[in-house]
From Swiss-Prot:
SUPFAM superfamilies: Radical SAM enzymes. The gene is bioB. Keywords: 2Fe-2S, 4Fe-4S, Biotin biosynthesis, Iron, Iron-sulfur, Metal-binding, S-adenosyl-L-methionine, Transferase. SMART domains: BATS, Elp3. Gene3D superfamilies: Aldolase class I (3.20.20.70). Binds 1 [4Fe-4S] cluster. The cluster is coordinated with 3 cysteines and an exchangeable S-adenosyl-L-methionine. Binds 1 [2Fe-2S] cluster. The cluster is coordinated with 3 cysteines and 1 arginine. Its cofactor is [4Fe-4S] cluster; [2Fe-2S] cluster. This is Biotin synthase. Homodimer. Catalyzes the conversion of dethiobiotin (DTB) to biotin by the insertion of a sulfur atom into dethiobiotin via a radical-based mechanism. Pathway: Cofactor biosynthesis; biotin biosynthesis; biotin from 7,8-diaminononanoate: step 2/2.
Length: 359
């Protein structure tokens, strides 16, 4: 997929990042990132050159990048944070060869393996999601795509969850055809997650059992069925900075409403085991770039934030406006109370919070 660059007219010239071999480097010109944020707020989209320059900026620029990105985030989302809750409704047993995934057929990671959970387990998890202040309950299965039994299970449980707990439902079921997307819409699913995961040019290096275009087609089916699209990616899989920029622009062109940015947790037993970790500064620059490219889209710091951002997690919420509360699919997240404390200390507010939440 090619995404045409926006016109460079009225745009801010990208700074010269001559010394990109050093994480120290030099400062960009004073006020550069504020001017770039103003450009975006005035309606002139960021260009690929500007986005790439942000990723190549020295670590000295990180505070300025985050501060400027916060202006954009605040314009569209104020100081609100939306919480998501993940439920691994079916674990392992996946026939796909996604190299980053501990549940894929090429993974030797010791993950739980079970078919789609029964009603009571899914309802119990929905109750936890509501108690933790989540607005959206994410039902996830490991599969190339849902079989008929799994589709029926989702169709049966979604109306009950929505009626009892007033949660939005995001379904992550793998590749979908047109009729499956229509059925999900009919049963009350609000949003479908299907990540692009990387750029089109890098995709065959992380998966060979389906294509980048397969994923894009699923998103088109979701859009055409009238549901919101949730799609993002994983950074730190050996891709180039240009690949990350391409993914951000592709998501923008598709009109994706919610963008989760994962930072690779190179799980032992997967083909990407031992992949060098991104620095917190590089992760922050990438998050900010996604915000500049997609100014009015929900941006979520997803898997890997605790591992890679570490003590800089709060800085991420100055550009992102959403996080998962609790654990991920096969890895642990930090304690929910730590997330509540972080949000409170930032002076931010949770969207859709409830009385049971300690914040």
């Amino acid at each position: 997929m090619s995404v045409a660059d926006s016109s460079a007219a009225d745009s801010v010239a990208a700074p010269d990042t001559a010394d990109t071999s050093s994480s120290v480097g030099v400062f960009s010109p004073p006020g550069y990132y504020d001017a770039l944020a103003q450009q975006v707020l005035d309606g002139t989209p960021i260009t690929r050159e500007q986005a790439l320059a942000m990723l190549e900026a020295s670590d000295l620029d990180v505070p300025a990048i985050i501060s400027a990105g916060y202006r954009i985030r605040h314009q569209y989302f104020g100081n609100t944070v939306q919480l998501y809750f993940l439920m691994n409704a079916k674990s392992g047993l996946c026939p796909e060869d996604c190299h980053y995934c501990s549940q894929s057929k090429v993974s030797d990671a010791p993950v739980p393996k079970y078919n789609i959970l029964k009603r009571d387990a899914l309802m119990d998890a929905a109750k936890v999601a509501a108690e933790r202040g989540a607005k959206t309950y994410c039902l996830v299965i490991s599969a190339r795509g849902p079989n008929e039994r799994e589709m029926k299970a989702v169709e049966e449980i979604v109306p009950e969850i929505k009626q009892k707990y007033n949660l939005d439902i995001c379904a992550c079921l793998g590749l979908l055809d047109e009729s499956q997307a229509a059925r999900l819409k009919a049963c009350g699913v609000d949003r479908v997650n299907h990540n692009l995961n990387s750029s089109e040019s890098h995709y065959e290096k992380i998966c060979t059992t389906h294509t980048y275009e397969d994923r894009v087609q699923t998103l088109r089916h979701v859009r055409d069925a009238g549901m919101e699209m949730c799609s993002g990616g994983i950074i730190g899989m050996g891709e180039s900075k240009s690949d990350i920029v391409s993914m951000a622009f592709d998501l923008n062109e598709l009109g994706v409403q919610s963008i989760p940015v994962n930072i690779l947790n190179a799980i032992d037993g997967t083909p990407l085991e031992g992949t060098a970790a991104l620095t917190p500064q590089d992760a922050l620059k990438a998050l900010a770039m996604f915000r500049f490219v997609n100014p009015d889209r929900e941006l979520r710091i997803a898997g890997g934030r605790e591992l890679h951002l570490r003590q800089l997690q709060p800085m991420g919420l100055y550009v992102a406006n959403s996080v998962f509360v609790g654990d991920y699919l096969t890895t642990q997240g930090q304690a929910p109370q730590a997330d509540y404390d972080m949000i409170r200390d930032l002076g931010f507010d949770v969207t859709g919070s409830c009385e049971e939440m300690s914040i």
